[in-house]
Amino acid sequence: MMYRYVKDAWKNPKDSYVRELMWERAPKWRRDPVIKRIERPTRIDRARALGYRAKPGYIVVRTRVRRGSQRKTRFKAGRRPTRMGVKKITTAKSIKRIAEERVARKYPNMEVLNSYWVWEDGKYKFYEVILVDPNHLAIKNDPKIYWICVKQHRGRVFRGLISEGKKNRGLRNRGKGAEKVR
């Protein structure tokens, strides 16, 4: 029942109590390491909707990624500015997917389950990534999540098999005309 109030507050975070909370938290988050394991999710409603459970084998990691398009260096060799390929270069991967992959590299024994947006400022976006340990007995014995222990689910995030990866690859669209998206 209480999750509903949390969910409503996070729908418009700048118009609710979340703004004051983040006013205190955001400066600390900027000083924290880029990838930091946290005790419990900031958005418990979102985390649980995406599969998080408060039990052994699950961890939540907060990560910070740059905002905006790709940063490319301007080289010294001569050519027209148009042909330099510095401005307006965007990656095929979303910022969220980049965040998930970085976390997965930091925790090689874990599998990424999903992630969600937490906050953003002028320079960074903050995401919380839910990780699952496929070798943990609590996970192996849980009928809801034991599928992640099977070998074909190793490195799912790098193969674009989680939610954001499927979205980036245009797999949300089905039927005739979907070829144009991919």
From Swiss-Prot:
GO biological process entries: cytoplasmic translation
Gene Ontology MF term list: RNA binding; structural constituent of ribosome
Recorded superkingdom: Archaea
GO cellular component, one term: cytosolic large ribosomal subunit
SUPFAM superfamilies: Ribosomal proteins S24e, L23 and L15e
Keyword Ribosomal protein on entry: yes
Entry-linked PROSITE patterns: RIBOSOMAL_L15E
Alphabetized InterPro entries for the sequence: Rbsml_eL15_core_dom_sf, Ribosomal_eL15, Ribosomal_eL15_arc, Ribosomal_eL15_CS, Ribosomal_uL23/eL15/eS24_sf
Keywords: Ribonucleoprotein, Ribosomal protein
Pfam families recorded: Ribosomal_L15e
Ribonucleoprotein keyword on record: yes
Similarity-based family: Belongs to the eukaryotic ribosomal protein eL15 family.
Name of the protein: Large ribosomal subunit protein eL15
